[in-house]
Amino acid sequence: MPNRSFSPRTFMGDHGISIDYNNLEKIVAPKPWKPSHSRSTSTNCTKFVEESLFEEAGNEIQTIILHSFNIYDDSVDSNNNNNNNNNNNNNNKNDDYNFQPPIRQSLSSPQQLVSIRPTPTKPKLVSFLNNNSKVNNNNNNNKTIMTCKVNSKNNINSLVNNNNSKIAINIESCSNLRNNEIQIDDNENINTEYITPNNIVNNILKCKLETQTPTSSQPQTISFLDTFESRVSISPSYNNGQGAISGSEKGSEIITTIINNNNNNNNNNSNNNNNNNNSNNNDNNNNINTKVDESNSNDNILLSQTIDTITENHSDGTLDMKIPLFIHSYSPLNCFNGSEPLTPPIRTHNPITMNQAFTESDLFQQGAELGLLSISPPPTLSISKQFKSATLF
C-alpha cells in the first residue's frame, strides 16, 4: 500500500464507514471533509488536502472491505458446492428439517475460512418412563437433569372445567437427579405445536394444560411448549416421583420438563401424614398414562410458570418438577462450549504513526480495521508546517 500524506481519521470523524450487510454494494467510504464546509469565516485553509486524494482513499477503503467479504463468500460457495456434491452422491433428500444455513466458524489456518453444516438429525419422540419400562440409556450422555420441588397455587383438579384459569408454581429447592431412563419411540403420529421466543416475556413460560376429569387411575396431561420448538406432554402421576413424559425432539435441541402430582386428590386437606402415605401407595397401583383429546376447547388451560413471584392462592397440593437440561451434541450451535468469537488484534501501537499493510491472511472481522491502518502513515513535519492552522489527529 502506498503511503498517504494524511490520516483517514482526519476526515472520518465519528461517522466511520457505512456497511450494509444485506447489500455489500452500499459500503460507502466517508465523505471528504473540507474547511470550506465549516461555518467558520476563516480563509486561511480553504482546502485541507486535494479532493482527489479523499476520493482515492475512499475507494481504497471500500476495495479493502469488499475484498475481505469476497474471501469469505468464496469459501462459503466452495464448501456449499462440496456439500451438495456429497449429498447427491449419497442420495440424501433435502427435507425442511434437514436444512441448516452455513455457520461461520473459527479458522483452522490463517489462509482458510471454514463453513460448517451440522449433521441433519431426524426428529424422534422421546419418552421418560418408569423403572419397569424398556429403556435405552445411550441418550443420557448429553444432558444434565435437575429436580426442583415446587408449590402449586391452585388445586389442578378444581380447574378442569375453567378454560381461563391459571396455575402459578414457585420453585422451592433443587437437587441433581441421575440415571433417568429414556426410551426412543419411532411413533411420530403426535400433534406438534410450537411457540417462538417472542412468546416468552419476563421469565414467564406460557404452557398449555390439557386436562380431563381426574380420577386416581387417570392422571392429568400437561403440554409444555418451549423456546427450542419442541413439544412435550407431561403426565402428573400419583406415585411419588415416577411420572411419565413424552415430547417430540427437533434435532438435538430440546428442553423437556417432568411434573409429577403428589397431591392426595381423594382425601381431605386435614388428613395426617399417615393417611397421605396410604393414599400415595394406593395411587401407585392405579397409575395410567393418558392423553387428552385436544379438540375439546374445555381441556385447554393456560399454565404460567414463574420463577420468583407467586400470583395465585395457595393450596395444599405440591408438584415435583424435573428439568433435563440438554447440551447440544455439536459445538457450532452451542452457546457455552463453542469457539471464541473472532476479535480484532490488540493494538500495541498508535495506528496514526505506523503503516500496516493489508494481506489475504487477515481475518474477516479484521479487514475493515486493517484497511484503515494500511493507509495511516506517520504525520510528517512538512504537513505540520504547510497547514499550521490544521489539527492532526
Swiss-Prot record:
Span list, region Disordered: 77-118, 259-296
Superkingdom as given in the UniProt entry: Eukaryota
Polar residues bias: start-end ranges: 103-114
Biased amino acid composition, Low complexity: 79-92, 259-289
Name of the protein in its database record: Uncharacterized protein DDB_G0274353
Organism whose genome encodes this protein: Dictyostelium discoideum (Social amoeba)
Phylogenetic classification of the source organism: Eukaryota, Amoebozoa, Evosea, Eumycetozoa, Dictyostelia
